[in-house]
Amino acid sequence: MNWIFNTLIQFLEDLNIDPSVVSLIDEDAKKLEEQFPKALKHPVVDEEIVYKILCEKYNLNALNVKTISETLNKEYKFGRNSKTALKKYLDYGKEEYLIQFFNTLMLENNTYIDREYIESVLAFCEPVSKEKIKNEFIKLWNEANEVNEYGKLKDYLLGIYSKLFSMGLENLRLIEIYNSNESLIKKVFKYESTIKELKEYCLSNQESITAGLAIKMFNEKYMELMKKEYQQDAIALKLEEHMNQLYVDNNINEYPYIFDRGNDILLLPTEEYDFVYFHIDQDFFNRFQDENKFLDYVLSSIKQIYRVLANEKVFALKIDNIYNNEKNLKWELYPKLTIYSEHFIQTKETARFYKAYDIAKDLLSKHEFRLLENDSEKNRENILKEYFSGKISEDELFSLVHVNMKKEHFFEFLNRFKYVHYGFTFNDCLVLDRVDKSFANGELENVISNATEILLIFYKFRADQRRIPCPSCGSLNISGNSYPEINNRSWECKSPYCPDRSKSNRGKRYSKKSNYMQWGAIYPKSHDIIPRELIKKWRRDIIVINNEQEIFEMLVKYFSFTDEKLLFINTNELPSVVTERENRKVVILSQKLKEKAYTSNVVVKESLEGEIEFFKNGLYLKNFTELYLPEDQRRVSPEINNFLNSGGRLKLIQGDSYEVLKSVEDNTFAAAVTSPPYYNAREYSQWPNLYLYFNDMYNIIKECFRTLKPGSVFLYNIADIVDNENIIVKSSMGNKRIPLGAYTIYFFQKAGFELLDNIIWDKGEPQSNRQKNDGKFTPHYQKPLNAYEHMFIFKKTGAPLTLSDDWQSKRGSWIKNIVPFQPVFKINSKGENILGHTAPFPEDIPRFVANVFTKHDNDIILDPFSGSLTSAIASYKSNRIGLGIELSPDYVELSRDRALLEGVTTKILNFN
């Protein structure tokens, strides 16, 4: 019997538990001992070691960590790494762990620390008693033992055994990790040469090193070879079409500067770069002199960027102010590039998480879809499931259902959902306030000054089912079919000797992305630590920028590690000032560097074009607008028009906004302003999926276009949100940041509106002072806090922009296209929000529209989603006629009461 069993038996006897129960883990222990026999040669002499292991597993020092960190937080930045190192010291009490804690704290703060003071704080910490640990274990043991749950008893014992076993493996050789995984390695890699290279690498590093470092080195080589095999398959054209490398230039990787003749991006190796920055500006646009050709080239470049960017890494896209015939294209490009980037890959999805029948069923609700017999929600789902799985034919399905669609339309519609549309994952839209520059602003040139640029951040998550080693033990004995994000697969370690098994002996859960983030945090190099000043500057998603290098510094520090290879495309300034200082390898692809650049001799016949078809005939966008709904009959309602023309300056129509607007005459309203219901973000706004949300919004937007006067404006306030689009999967794996602003612009323009500008509503400092970085100060953890909403200024075409005669004296603080003001909550003496509405917006917004973009006292200003009547009341106060449309009876009553508080009576028409 080895020292590990002896230690475990001694612990059980101390708790008066029959030590013979260790036989439950005999078989598992034997397997471990065969793989790593040397673990049995290093006995742990601390007789209390099992109690310390359990103290760690049960997180019993959590309160001590909290108390100490709060005390030290006055002097030091106390991140997640420092807390983890502190907990390890408190759990085990080893001097080496105390030194690790000091070093971690010093690294996170980038300064020397007062060790004597910190030790005095630690001295006041009350250690977790042996009795408390014992009672915790006995409680769990007895609960399982009383109902004969031998599986749990085995897990409890194996959890202790595996931790002791891993302690016997304080030092490892790489070949030991390889040997323990050899059979699985041969299943993961395709080529004998790859397996041979991995084994030779492990044999060439025969030195016994700390287990953590050995596992990290093994994993890094393993991931390098995974990339190498993938690149080989890309050149051999064995991958999906969008990932294959059609042209090869064996010399191109030797040069840091590359002159792109127009399509040389096709020569760059697949998944070669750990970060890609793509900059589009006026000079870039001028090479084309045609908006569609320019857009096609940019879209095609984004498609290639997806190919060349390493998986789970970041793509940053900077959009400058670009002019075509005096029209600023900046915010017009934003929706096209964002929507395309997220959805340009059309593919048939066979993964179990995608339920085409469920998504289609939601949209068919618009067509009175039902079964002719035994109709129920579940049976509708089942019949569609049978169709999508090929069990019934089109004719059979159509004979069993009622649906308000022609047969050919029905199946064209259904068959769209055999495909999903992937791409990058939208992460953020950062608004850059360029205090060093000012830009022209089209029709708003003299009204609102323009000082903004856009920086979009995307992640790439390409589905990759190949196993990756556990970061804690290096094992490939893993399983898992869950996804933190779509296409970002996570694994659970099944190795019984993994040191990071949980309280219930579950294995460590990890993904490729979490691995490189955690290793960067655990083994940070000096250039990987992000300075406190940089985090403070980029804390919010509206950032004052003085020069281009500030942008490079953030991108390099936030989204790359030391020695990684970064690709910059079409930069105005060289990023080498930052990249050389931060020890990154940089490649620049540009048409501006002819004199120093490498020009390939490989002739590329393919052209970067054809991607604009995504917007003309792509299936993805059809799902929002081409639903084959019956054409609505528009009938002008005398009742509504009499109501609009009657006396009174504050009016409210209770009814569905779309139905009301269909009944209004053309060219009725002088302006519109609203904050619509955000997709599933409030209790009053719930849609099954994003398709149906924007289908409803689009129909209302079209009616607003028809009923507005030519030259009038529509100010539309909306924010990007975190939610599930429910167009691929309905579980939490589908949760992501949804660029509602991008879709809003797209559908307004499709309805006929012209976008004049996006005025940024700066909502000030977020209520939380917490930086979203999980307490870590290394790459990929930083997340700026959302501090703004969009206020899009759309104009109905057909006439010059309508401006009031005295707009200059009435525009107030609306001088430039970033306007700061706080959200409004009117609180009474009882601390209650008397506006009642969960998302009220300031009267400054509709007042700005009334004062600047309308001319006459009898002008009607429309709010199609009235809420608590803010827009109509502000219009009334500006001596205009304010009209709200509101579906909810509760909000109609709230609006009436609110107006009375303002001393105004509301004229209300019920149009339900």
Swiss-Prot record:
Keywords tagged on the record: DNA-binding, Methyltransferase, Restriction system, S-adenosyl-L-methionine, Transferase
EC number(s) stated in the UniProt entry for this protein: 2.1.1.113
Catalytic activity: a 2'-deoxycytidine in DNA + S-adenosyl-L-methionine = an N(4)-methyl-2'-deoxycytidine in DNA + S-adenosyl-L-homocysteine + H(+)
Matches recorded under SUPFAM superfamilies: S-adenosyl-L-methionine-dependent methyltransferases
Pfam families: N6_N4_Mtase (PF01555)
GO molecular function (one): site-specific DNA-methyltransferase (cytosine-N4-specific) activity
GO biological process: DNA restriction-modification system; methylation
Its biological purpose: A beta subtype methylase.
Family: Belongs to the N(4)/N(6)-methyltransferase family. N(4) subfamily.
Name of this protein: Type II beta methyltransferase M.BslI
Organism: Bacillus sp. (strain NEB-606)
Lineage: Bacteria, Bacillati, Bacillota, Bacilli, Bacillales
